[in-house]
Structures are given as structure tokens and as C-alpha cells.
Curated annotation (Swiss-Prot):
Gene that encodes the chain: mutL
Origin: domain of life: Bacteria
SUPFAM superfamilies: ATPase domain of HSP90 chaperone/DNA topoisomerase II/histidine kinase, DNA mismatch repair protein MutL, Ribosomal protein S5 domain 2-like
A Pfam family it matches: HATPase_c_3
A Gene Ontology term for the protein's cellular component: mismatch repair complex
Keyword Zinc listed: no
Name the UniProt record assigns to this protein: DNA mismatch repair protein MutL
């Protein structure tokens, strides 16, 4: 058996680096946190090659004398705590004394520093954790740390790094969180020769949000400030209209430390429980302030998670803070609050006049008006009116039976009595029977009309068929868009006026990595300075109403995408984008359809390779069999 022996310092530092330095973003986080602890007011971060080739952090903080600079490269050397009791009330971002020696152990490392009261600075060069040169050096007050060739001596770690764009996105996300947590500090982030973002450093959180997340998002945030016995919660929560497809826009800070906290996340999402559909997540920038001794920040190697002593009360504070903000903001469009606190509803005379003129589906527009996707003309099966058809131009009274209100009430009573008849249990309905190919079966269907302007009822060989018009159109659009993207032949609709879209630094880096997927899917876009994207064209048929949300949702999905080695990433992402675009472009429930529209929809669905489901796996067609109908009618 091998004898137990002490590891040499160099090996021990490389092992420690495995815990502290996971990727270039970890280096940036540790160095910027050191700068913040040094009371810096200006921080410049420069990277190259996604952080592999270069990471440089320059600050105007208090700097270090030569003795402290040398000591900083020793493990567990720190100015931030003295005893174990200090761990119970940590007020600094760093405290373990592991960051600099761990980073130096796996890189070509340079430290240049000067206190404000010293005339000369000091420079230390290290390679693989060993100091190779040091001495006086002319420099401005503050500290500059340069890290080159990260993991040059640990090639196994290099294999697990992602593309430069992905690593840059991770760095951008870390810096976004640190800059939001410290709006009084001016941050500048540069990748190569391009400036990614710059914050003003005025202490105004709204200005920092606008610089980092975009002006449009800053306009849609609601202020939050709530306090209970355990915590104070302040910052912003987003209106439900800007909810995202993932949680990448949830920023939580505990005592100014950017953290992941499941307790706060659950509390926030519970506050939005009845305001957002499944799969949509609220936006927030929330600062949680608790007594330092009531939160443990030493429970994770990277200090990314915390544990609250009064977890239940903190969750309650987050929940109440969000609920109060949402309650104070009138989420119903068109209402206003007068000076004396009275809620005023605007005059509906104009809407009544519009109703007399006839209803126009959302997005359809009127003759001569621009807009997005044109909705089909209104059509529905009706018992009244010539030919069983009622046009949208008829006044409201045309929908009442002859005899006025009394007849309407009698008709309502008859409908309620009819509702007592046992309904068909759709759980007992089946998908398309497999006695024939789905396409052939759909071609054999005879459309009867719309049900609730959402489903198409058809007579078919096995019984009554119901087709979800949205799911069916989704499948059609998906297969066309996906096939065209594979062949790089997607038809593009050029926009008369380009759309501008503000992205986060992480989203912009992800877009740059996946620009080819967007291009082959029909999106013509280019960077427009900073983190702004200029969109010149979209896939034909998509329209412009949902382009911004579609692009942001897809980028959010990619940001959270964990891809195993060897996975055909491009094709999978192409499918995801096609499915998301199809969902946005497809006709919706409650869209009225003309008979010719229904016939075209069925014909196109029958031609699909997989007409049974939409691209998300929901059925497009179900069948209520003849035997089930006979059973329900007691035949």
C-alpha cells in the first residue's frame, strides 16, 4: 500500500483551482469581487478568446503594498476575516484567500498594484503558481490582474470548455449580475476590440438596468420595497408582459452578493402563479437584505448559493414584495387612478361603435392598415341568418332571437338544460385511428364547421373528428420552415423598417454563436452597436408582431441548453427555432375561418410527414368513435 504523504504546494494549488476556477467566467468573478472589496469605483474587464487567451481586470481600488501583494498569492491569505467567528457575519464578497493562488496555479499570471499613497507600484509575474519575477513598476493607483493561457498546464480542463461564444456568454452573465448589484460602480466590459457594455456608475439602478438589459425592459419594471422582521426586499419585478421562456432574467442579490436561491425563486414564481402561463417565468432584480449572521454564504465552493437562518420569513418577504408591486400596478390596460385614488375606467363609446361596425380579429387590420400576420376573415356555423352564415358586419342585435330580451332569456334556459346531457368524455376519445395512414385519413374527412372557433369538426370513417386548428397549422408551418432551413432555402420577408432589439451581453454572445441558424431559418439580422440587434427580415408568413419575443425566448433556451458531447447541436437547435416560430405564426384559438380556409388547412395537414401531432407533441386530431356516440345517446 502506498504511504500517505503531504502534497507539494503546487499540486495542492492545482487541486484547489479545480474547485474555484471552473471556467474563464470563474476567473472574472473572483477578480471583480476582489476589486469591489477593494472599494473600486471604476472596473474595466477585458477578455480575448472567450477568456482562454486573456482575462484582464483593472480597478481604481485601494491597491496593495509589496508585502501584501506577495502574500496574496499564498493560499488562505486574506485581509477579510481573522477568526472562525468572522464566518458568521461576512460582509465582503471574498473571504477564503483561495482565488488568486488558484488562478495563478493554472495560468500565466501578472499582478500590478499601487496604493494611492505610494509613488511606485509593484509587479509580480507567476507561471503555474510559481513566482518568476517581481519588482517595482510604474502604474496608476489601484490594481491590474492579467491572466493569460488559462489551463495551459491542465489540458484535461481545456477539453471541457465550450466555444468562445459560449464562454463569453457566461462571462457576460456574471458581469451583468455584478454590475446590477453595484450600480454605484462604473463597469466597462470589452471583448477583443469591441465594447460589450458600459454602466454609468451613478448609483441609479434604473440606469444600470437600461445599460445592461435594454431601455425597453427598464420601462416594464415595477419598483419593489417591502420589509418584515427577517428581511428587506427591494429592487424591481417585471410586468407579466415581459415574462421569459427561462429564468435567465431572474437576478437575486443577498446583501449585495449575486446568488442562486431556490427559496426566493419559488416565492417569486408563486406571486405570479395566476398571471403567467406554464413555461413563462417572471423577470426580477431583487435585493434581499438580512442580518449578516442570519445567512450562511459558505455553503458552496463558488459562493453561488446561500442558506437563510429564517428561510420561511425570507420567502414570505419576497412573495409579499412581488404581490404588492403587482397589485399597485394596474395590470388591466386602459384603467387609470385619479389624484384622489379613484379607479377610472375609460369611456367605452368608441368600442361600442366599433362593435356595431363589426369585429376585426387581432392582427388582421382594416383595409389599408399595416400589421403582422393577417388573420383569416370571420366565419362561423350559425343556426340563424341566410345559409346558416352570420357576417361580422351585422349589428349586435342580429345575434338576439326575434322577440328580444325575453326570447334571449328563454334560449339561455334551454341551453342550460341541454348542458345537463352527459358530455362526451374526451379522455375516452382516441387519436387518429391507425387503420389507415394519417395523411390518407385526413384527406377522407368532410369538414362540418368550427366549434368554438377553435376546433374543426369533421365527419370521417370512424366517427366524429375534431382538429385543433392551432396545433394543425403549427405542424404545417413547422415542417415547411424546418425543411427550408435544412436546405437553406427559407423565404424571407424583408421589413420596410428594421426592428431593433436590445439584448443582454450573454444573449448577444449566444446570437453570434448561432447566427448561422437564424440566417438559414429566414432571419436577416446584424449587430447594431453594443448589445443591439437590427432585424431586416423574418421568415415569410411569420409577421412582425412576435419577432422580438421569439428571438429572446430562443436565446434564453440556448443559454440554459446543456449539450452533451457528440450531440448534433445545430440540427436540434434548428428544430427548436422552427417549432417556436411555428407556434407564434400559426392561427390561434378563436380565430374564425372561412370554409375555403378549413379546406386548405386540412389539405396541407394531410401532406405533412407527421400530421398526428404539433411539433411540441400535442395531438392535432382526435376521434370520437361511432360506438362512443351511440353509447352517449343510449342507442
Amino acid at each position: 500500500m502506498a504511504r500517505i504523504r503531504l502534497l507539494d504546494e503546487r499540486t495542492a494549488n492545482q487541486i484547489a483551482a479545480g474547485e474555484v476556477v471552473e471556467r474563464p467566467a470563474s476567473v472574472v468573478k473572483e477578480l471583480v469581487e476582489n476589486a469591489l472589496d477593494a472599494q473600486a469605483k471604476r472596473i474595466v474587464v477585458e477578455v480575448s478568446g472567450g477568456g482562454r487567451e486573456l482575462v484582464r481586470v483593472t480597478d481604481d481600488g485601494i491597491g496593495m503594498v509589496p508585502e501584501d501583494a506577495r502574500l496574496a498569492l499564498q493560499r488562505h491569505a486574506t485581509s477579510k476575516i481573522r477568526t472562525a467567528e468572522d464566518l458568521n457575519a461576512i460582509t465582503t464578497l471574498g473571504f477564503r484567500g483561495e482565488a488568486l493562488p488558484s488562478i495563478a496555479a493554472v495560468s500565466q499570471f501578472e499582478l500590478i498594484t499601487r496604493p494611492h499613497d505610494q509613488l511606485a507600484g509593484y509587479r509580480i509575474l507567476a507561471e503555474g503558481g510559481q513566482i518568476v519575477a517581481e519588482g517595482e513598476h510604474g502604474c496608476p493607483a489601484g490594481t491590474r490582474v492579467t491572466v493569460r493561457d488559462l489551463f495551459f498546464n491542465v489540458p484535461a480542463r481545456l477539453k471541457y470548455l465550450k466555444t468562445n461564444a459560449t464562454e463569453l456568454a457566461q462571462i457576460g452573465d456574471i458581469l451583468t449580475r455584478l454590475a446590477l448589484a453595484n450600480p454605484e460602480v462604473a463597469f466597462r466590459f470589452q471583448s477583443g476590440q469591441a465594447q460589450v457594455f458600459a454602466t454609468p456608475g451613478t448609483g441609479d439602478l434604473t440606469a444600470a438596468v437600461a445599460a445592461l438589459l435594454g431601455r425597453e425592459m427598464a420601462k416594464e419594471l415595477l419598483p419593489v420595497d417591502y420589509r418584515n422582521d427577517a428581511a428587506r426586499v427591494h429592487g424591481f419585478v417585471g410586468r407579466p408582459t415581459i415574462a421569459r421562456a427561462g429564468r435567465s432574467h431572474q437576478y437575486f442579490f443577498v446583501n449585495r452578493r449575486a446568488v442562486r436561491t431556490i427559496a426566493a425563486r419559488y416565492a417569486l414564481e408563486e406571486a405570479y402563479a395566476h398571471l403567467l402561463p406554464n413555461g413563462r417565468y417572471p423577470v426580477c432584480i431583487l435585493f434581499i437584505e438580512v442580518e449578516p449572521h442570519e445567512v450562511d454564504v459558505n455553503v458552496h465552493p463558488t459562493k453561488a448559493e446561500v442558506r437563510f437562518q429564517r428561510d420561511r420569513e425570507v420567502r414570505a418577504a419576497v412573495y409579499q414584495a412581488a404581490r404588492h408591486a403587482l397589485g399597485a400596478a394596474l395590470l388591466i390596460p386602459g384603467t387609470e387612478v385619479t389624484a384622489d385614488g379613484e379607479v377610472r375606467v375609460p369611456d367605452r363609446a368608441e368600442e361600442k361603435a366599433a362593435l356595431q361596425r363589426g369585429w376585426v380579429p387581432p392582427g388582421a387590420g382594416r383595409p389599408g392598415e399595416g400589421g403582422g400576420r393577417a388573420a383569416p376573415p370571420p366565419w362561423r356555423v350559425s343556426a340563424g341568418g341566410p345559409g346558416g352564415q352570420t357576417t361580422a358586419r351585422e349589428p349586435v342585435q342580429a345575434y338576439l332571437p326575434a322577440g328580444g330580451l325575453q326570447a334571449a332569456l328563454a334560449q339561455r334556459a334551454a341551453e342550460e338544460a341541454a348542458a345537463a346531457v352527459p358530455a362526451v368524455d374526451l379522455a375516452e376519445a382516441t387519436l387518429v385511428p391507425r387503420s389507415a395512414e394519417p395523411g390518407e385519413l385526413i384527406r377522407a374527412l368532410r369538414p362540418l364547421g368550427q366549434v368554438h372557433r377553435s376546433y374543426i369538426a369533421c365527419d370521417g370513417p370512424e366517427g366524429l373528428y375534431l382538429i385543433d386548428q392551432h396545433a394543425a397549422h403549427e405542424r404545417i408551418f413547422f415542417e415547411r420552415l424546418y425543411a427550408a432551413a435544412q436546405e437553406q432555402a427559407t423565404a424571407v420577408q424583408r421589413l420596410l423598417f428594421p426592428l431593433t432589439l436590445d439584448l443582454t451581453p450573454a444573449q448577444m454572445a449566444i446570437w453570434q454563436e448561432n447566427a448561422a441558424i437564424f440566417a438559414e431559418s429566414g432571419f436577416e439580422a446584424e449587430p447594431f452597436g453594443g448589445n443591439t440587434l437590427l432585424i431586416h427580415g423574418v421568415p415569410a408568413g411569420l409577421g412582425t408582431d412576435h419577432v422580438a419575443r421569439l428571438v429572446c425566448d430562443f436565446l434564453d433556451r440556448l443559454q440554459e441548453d446543456q449539450v452533451a458531447p457528440g450531440t448534433p447541436v445545430t440540427d436540434r437547435r434548428r428544430r427548436v427555432l422552427a417549432a417556436m416560430a411555428a407556434c407564434k405564426a400559426a392561427i390561434k384559438a378563436r380565430d374564425p375561418l372561412q370554409p375555403e380556409d378549413i379546406a386548405a388547412l386540412l389539405s396541407d395537414l394531410a401532406a405533412c410527414a407527421s400530421p398526428e401531432t404539433c411539433p411540441h407533441g400535442r395531438p392535432t386530431v382526435i376521434c370520437v368513435s361511432i360506438s362512443e356516440l351511440e353509447k352517449r345517446f343510449k342507442r
